[in-house]
Structure formats: structure tokens, C-alpha cells
Amino acid sequence: MSHTEALALIRAEAGESGLHVAARMGEDLEPTRVARLATAIRVVADGLRGAASIDRELAASLHILGFLVSREAGSWTSRTQKLPQAVFDSLIDLESAVEDLFFDISR
């Protein structure tokens, strides 16, 4: 995936019909969709490595995807109903990708 494609995917998934809306509505989150998004974030992170700042719109999109998606998804769970392990793992990977970009960490 190119840097431009990755940015487009990040912005789309943070938008009106994106992943965070699906999580807010209680829809099933496909681990492959989340994994593709994490890959896109890592592509963008590689392109920004060493940069002193990032675009405000990108930062807002990353905040939505890295922190609000898992919070929204978690709000639909209960003591008796948990997120499927594959979904949970993919959301943790998504959060890690966002944190790595913000802190300029290469793994």
C-alpha cells in the first residue's frame, strides 16, 4: 500500500462511515479490516519517521481510530459478553500502531 493510499484509508475509517461509527453502532468489527488499517498507519508512520510534527487532520483521525474505536467497541461488552479474541487482539494492534506513530517508534 502506498503512502497516499494509506492516508486515504485512515481518513475514510475515521470518517462518517468508518470503523469508529461501526464500533459506536455495535456492529461486528472484522479483524482483517482493523489489521489493514493498522498496516496503513504503519505505512504512514514510516513516511513520517523523524518528522517534528504531523498534520492536525491526520492527528485527529489517528486519535479517533487509536483510542475511540476500542472504547466504543468495549462499551458494547458486558461481564458475560466479551469481544472475540481476534477482535480484541486487532484493536490492541491498532492502538499500538497509533502510539508508535505518535512516539516515532519503529518496531
Spell out what each predicted region is.
Residues 1-38:
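Short terminal alpha-helical segments
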